[in-house]
A protein has these predicted regions:
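Short loop/turn segments that flank or connect secondary-structure elements
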Residues: 1-21, 28-36, 40-261
Length: 261
């Protein structure tokens, strides 16, 4: 789909009408810090939140609420005639909407899908509300920590992929004539979160999605650094116990599936 790239000084009809249209029929992806923030806001554990409000193993919010006039189900965290029940902890996707964010060559760009401003479909009344610059909108939505978390988790996923490549290239697996590992990587890259969740052992899913780390909502960096350290140590312990080419193959597939997840 075509996207429209934006500059930070561009003024758009970004004042929310609080109609709740964007809280219905969408897909909201979560990283582990966002899940922990939401659970903290609900005063439940991350594991409990994952079961109650997520699908695809905890990587996506469950839209299983009442349907709107378009027949689209509400997010499970949406309350009719009130709005988001966890608004102060809402994830980056919700803070940015209707904008999106993409990072290329270590530079972030803000976009919206298509060529027509998304809110005009379902919330045309925003045209009667004050326009806001993209920069002011981002500041008002307090996206900075959530953008930091998004970028940090992309790096963590790359670290897991690097472990997978190390297992393939530095253990003799590739030289042994193995082709199954690359085949499984390609297949795994085509799977959705639900399908990947079914292939990941429970202890690895929990280590990745709901780590037992205390959250301080004002210190995202410490949470993510602790999470990365735990994943690296768990991966190293796992790798240290391997001996056969089949062991290396299975571990390389596991690490790449973790990266895709």
């Amino acid at each position: 789909m075509n996207v429209t790239k934006l500059n930070l000084n561009e003024s758009l009809p970004l004042t929310c009408s609080r109609k709740g249209t964007c809280c219905h029929g969408n897909q909201v992806l979560l990283n582990p810090w966002e899940l922990a923030r939401l659970a903290h806001e609900k005063n439940i554990s991350a594991s409990e939140f994952r079961v109650a409000f997520c699908v695809q193993g905890g990587s996506v919010l469950h839209f299983n609420g009442e349907k709107d006039q378009r027949g689209k189900a509400a997010c499970g965290l949406y309350t009719d005639n009130f709005g988001c029940s966890v608004h102060t902890a809402r994830p980056l996707a919700c803070r940015l909407f209707p904008l999106g964010r993409q990072v290329q060559h270590e530079k972030a760009e803000y976009i919206f899908q298509g060529t027509t401003f998304p809110c005009l479909n379902g919330c045309s009344e925003v045209l009667d509300l004050p326009k806001i610059t993209v920069a002011d909108y981002l500041e008002g939505q307090e996206t900075a920590d959530f953008e930091l978390a998004q970028d940090a988790y992309l790096e963590i996923m790359q670290n897991l992929a690097d472990i997978a490549f190390t297992l393939l290239l530095e253990t003799g697996l590739s030289e042994s004539g193995d082709t199954a590992t690359l085949t499984q990587w390609r297949k795994s890259g085509l799977l959705n979160g639900e399908e990947l969740a079914q292939l990941l052992p429970t202890e690895w899913q929990e280590a990745l999605i709901v780590p037992s780390i205390s959250i301080n909502k004002t210190d995202v960096q410490s949470f993510i650094e602790a999470h990365n350290d735990r994943l690296q140590k768990q991966a190293q312990l796992h790798v240290n116990g391997l001996s056969s080419m089949n062991d290396f193959h299975e571990a390389a597939v596991l690490m790449m599936r973790m990266a895709f997840y």
